[in-house]
């Protein structure tokens, strides 16, 4: 079974990246098992390999990290749950198909949102999970991955209760029309992060 590793405090992006890469190397050389890291980050803007400089509007003294994942700019911070699976798509009956893997990550989020009667959707020609509300379409989760020798790293970020104002420092995912939301904003109440993490763990093992 894939090892589930939960970090109990917001960590720097660079620390999480080192953990992912170390686990990936261990899987490749046979010294480590597959793992999922679930955590929150300290405030950071991350830029994927497709990010453009003019998509960073105002960093608000928030650190900026350029990464090797797919995608453009996004924000990570406390109140946003991050899932970083480091798993082998060539093993355990999985499919060596990146699009299928990204779709499975979206399904994980969509299934978890059902516990709160929130209907998550995917949108053609975009990556991530969205919701349709009376105020229009809003993004609730971002997905950005990289695959090395069919081993995955990076992953998905789900807005539970982050400071949504901090998304205004970037053009999220390169789309000026993107409006972000969170579970707490949609419910107009706080949910317990540990409860939500337990849901994600349950739903992850159903898919992967």
UniProtKB/Swiss-Prot annotation:
It is an enzyme of class 2 (transferase). It holds the Pfam family LplA-B_cat. It catalyses: octanoyl-[ACP] + L-lysyl-[protein] = N(6)-octanoyl-L-lysyl-[protein] + holo-[ACP] + H(+). Residues 30-208 form the BPL/LPL catalytic domain. Its EC number is 2.3.1.181. The active site is at 173 (acyl-thioester intermediate). Pathway: Protein modification; protein lipoylation via endogenous pathway; protein N(6)-(lipoyl)lysine from octanoyl-[acyl-carrier-protein]: step 1/2. One of its GO terms (cellular component) is cytoplasm. InterPro entries: aa-tRNA-synth_II/BPL/LPL, BPL_LPL_catalytic, Octanoyltransferase, Octanoyltransferase_CS. Substrate binds at residues 69-76, 142-144, 155-157. Catalyzes the transfer of endogenously produced octanoic acid from octanoyl-acyl-carrier-protein onto the lipoyl domains of lipoate-dependent enzymes. Lipoyl-ACP can also act as a substrate although octanoyl-ACP is likely to be the physiological substrate. Belongs to the LipB family. This is Octanoyltransferase. It comes from Orientia tsutsugamushi (strain Boryong). The gene is lipB.
